[in-house]
Amino acid sequence: MYKILLLLFISLFFVSCGLKNNAFRYFEKDEIETKGVQYTKKTDILKDNEVDVIFWATYLNKVDKKISDTNEELFLVSVYFANKESQDIFENKYSFLLNEIEPVSVEKVEKDNQNFKSLMLKNNWGKYYLVKFTSQDVYTLTIQLKDQDSNTAQLNFEK
């Protein structure tokens, strides 16, 4: 009995001294992709208890140091409209706001864009947008996806 416990204790000791479990150690991910996952959030807009819009946003200023030195707040945003034929935010009359301020620009990003390929979360159905806002001197950034009928999805990011 003591021999079994001793072997179990020694085995446990060697196993616990090994590498700690990390979700990304089984995948080949570069630093940008890993940070992209860390600074990406998702929310939904529900209508009649069913998902109508899926909204993802990645705060790019936290992902890449080069971006954080600019005077802009940059987000890579993905939007999927569940029950709509068109996936375009403008055709569906949606807009973005950051702390109630409109963006400087909204650019459509193609899925094969090499600059953002490692940040795109394999969303084959929705569309991606690069949304630029003027820099804000606040601690919390709240990006909103809003339509004309006051349906809103919002995500909060720390600056």
Regions found by a protein language model. Give the residues of each.
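Bacterial signal peptide processing site
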Residues: 18-21
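C-terminal motif of bacterial Sec signal peptides marking the signal peptidase cleavage site
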Residues: 13-16
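Short, low-complexity, disordered segments immediately C-terminal to signal peptides
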Residues: 23-31
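Edge beta-strands of extracellular beta-sandwich domains
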Residues: 151-159
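Sec-dependent signal peptide recognition
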Residues: 2-8
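Short, solvent-exposed, Trp/other aromatic-anchored flexible loops in extracytoplasmic proteins
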Residues: 101-149
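Post-signal-peptide N-terminal segment of Sec-exported extracytoplasmic proteins
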Residues: 37-69
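Mid-length scaffold segments of soluble, non-membrane domains
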Residues: 65-111
